[in-house]
């Protein structure tokens, strides 16, 4: 991937991340700076599965899924830098200082800005922020680990 601003669509994202519906939470990557920063977009619609129960009559995107979207953006950044990326997964190792400032609701477009704080071998700490327009909706520091991807069962 290039250093300059670059757009990756959901098809490109699926080549990097193993997540699929209903847990793929990135629609587009709009900025990518190798080993440093990524900016991704999540378009939130009323059709999201989680709105069925969170909350009926007042749909709000669960905060934990906003943090997951931050982690997925970070995963897209990190996994592109390692050899054999299709044989690896990025998993949570910790969440620190998660703060939720504004509800995310159907119709919102969430801009996920993720910066690398530290990255050593297979472990990283990332600072992520989720914005709706110019309003900060969520911020969190996430720690993650790159691990081998388990082999797929033969019948899958």
Curated annotation (Swiss-Prot):
Q: Which residues form the active site?
A: 54
- Look up keyword Lipid metabolism and say if it applies: yes
Give its E.C. classification number.
Answer: 4.2.1.59
Q: Which SUPFAM superfamilies match?
A: Thioesterase/thiol ester dehydrase-isomerase (SSF54637)
Could you tell me what reaction this enzyme catalyses?
a (3R)-hydroxyacyl-[ACP] = a (2E)-enoyl-[ACP] + H2O
Which subcellular locations apply to this protein?
Cytoplasm
Is-annotated flag, keyword Repeat?
no
Entry keyword set: Cytoplasm, Lipid A biosynthesis, Lipid biosynthesis, Lipid metabolism, Lyase
Main localization category: cytoplasm
- The stretch of residues making up the signal peptide is none
**Coiled coil location:** none
Q: Name one GO molecular function term.
A: (3R)-hydroxyacyl-[acyl-carrier-protein] dehydratase activity
Its BP terms in the Gene Ontology are: fatty acid biosynthetic process; lipid A biosynthetic process
Q: Name one GO cellular component term.
A: membrane
Q: What is any Pfam family matched here?
A: FabA
| Stated family | Belongs to the thioester dehydratase family. FabZ subfamily.
Kindly give the PANTHER family that the UniProt entry links to this protein.
3-HYDROXYACYL-[ACYL-CARRIER-PROTEIN] DEHYDRATASE (PTHR30272:SF1)
Supply the HAMAP family for this chain: FabZ
Q: What does this protein do?
A: Involved in unsaturated fatty acids biosynthesis. Catalyzes the dehydration of short chain beta-hydroxyacyl-ACPs and long chain saturated and unsaturated beta-hydroxyacyl-ACPs.
- Recorded protein name is 3-hydroxyacyl-[acyl-carrier-protein] dehydratase FabZ
Q: Which gene encodes it?
A: fabZ
């Amino acid at each position: 991937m290039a250093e300059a601003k670059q757009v990756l669509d959901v098809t490109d994202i699926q080549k990097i991340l193993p997540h699929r519906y209903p847990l793929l939470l990135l629609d587009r990557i709009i900025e990518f700076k190798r080993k440093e920063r990524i900016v991704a977009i999540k378009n939130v619609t009323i059709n999201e599965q989680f709105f069925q129960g969170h909350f009926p009559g007042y749909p709000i995107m669960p905060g934990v899924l906003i943090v997951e979207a931050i982690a997925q953006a970070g995963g897209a950044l990190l996994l592109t830098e390692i050899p054999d990326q299709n044989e690896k997964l990025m998993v949570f190792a910790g969440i620190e200082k998660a703060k939720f400032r504004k509800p995310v609701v159907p119709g919102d477009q969430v801009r996920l800005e993720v910066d690398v704080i530290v990255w050593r071998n297979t472990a990283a700490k990332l600072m992520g922020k989720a914005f709706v327009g110019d309003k900060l909706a969520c911020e969190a520091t996430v720690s993650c680990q790159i691990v081998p991807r388990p082999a797929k069962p033969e019948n899958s």
